[in-house]
């Protein structure tokens, strides 16, 4: 089985381009290839009821839920907006993601 390739990776700063969290930015915490989804820090918060275990108290906690990968786009800090990316091959053979508009590097 072939692994899926996405335009976002763990640690990238992304902006949500559709849905209830539209126009908000955050850092990608996790990429979920089986669900075609990403988890973004502080966005798409849901409440979960947690049962008490041992010395941990129970109660209602908030955590991030997954967003579909098509609803997020990489955020360029130079352009200050979500952008499409291009893969640029450097002279040493290394691949680097760059902004299509301003040609700046989007690597972490």
UniProtKB/Swiss-Prot annotation:
Assembly information from the UniProt record: Part of the 50S ribosomal subunit.
SUPFAM superfamilies documented for this protein: Translation proteins SH3-like domain
Gene3D superfamilies: 2.30.30.30
CDD domains: KOW_RPL26
Entries under InterPro entries matching the protein: KOW, Rib_uL2_dom2, Ribosomal_uL24, Ribosomal_uL24_KOW, Translation_prot_SH3-like_sf
Family stated for the protein in its record: Belongs to the universal ribosomal protein uL24 family.
Record flagged with keyword Ribonucleoprotein: yes
A Pfam entry, by short name: ribosomal_L24
Any one GO MF annotation of this record: rRNA binding
Stated name of the protein: Large ribosomal subunit protein uL24
Protein function: One of two assembly initiator proteins, it binds directly to the 5'-end of the 23S rRNA, where it nucleates assembly of the 50S subunit. One of the proteins that surrounds the polypeptide exit tunnel on the outside of the subunit.
Secretion signal, residue range per the UniProt entry: none
GO biological process: translation
Any single Gene Ontology cellular-component annotation: ribonucleoprotein complex
Superkingdom of source: Bacteria
Keywords recorded for this protein, A-Z: Ribonucleoprotein, Ribosomal protein, RNA-binding, rRNA-binding
Keyword Ribosomal protein on entry: yes
């Amino acid at each position: 089985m072939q692994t899926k390739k996405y335009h976002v990776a763990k640690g990238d700063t992304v902006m949500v381009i559709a849905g209830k969290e539209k126009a908000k930015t955050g850092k990608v915490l996790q990429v979920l290839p089986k669900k075609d989804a990403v988890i973004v820090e502080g966005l798409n918060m849901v409440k979960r009821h947690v049962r008490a275990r041992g010395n941990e108290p129970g109660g209602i906690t908030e955590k991030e839920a997954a967003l579909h990968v098509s609803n997020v786009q990489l955020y360029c800090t130079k352009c200050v907006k979500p952008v499409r990316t291009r893969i640029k091959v450097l002279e040493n053979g290394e691949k680097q993601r760059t902004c299509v508009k301003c040609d700046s590097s989007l690597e972490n």
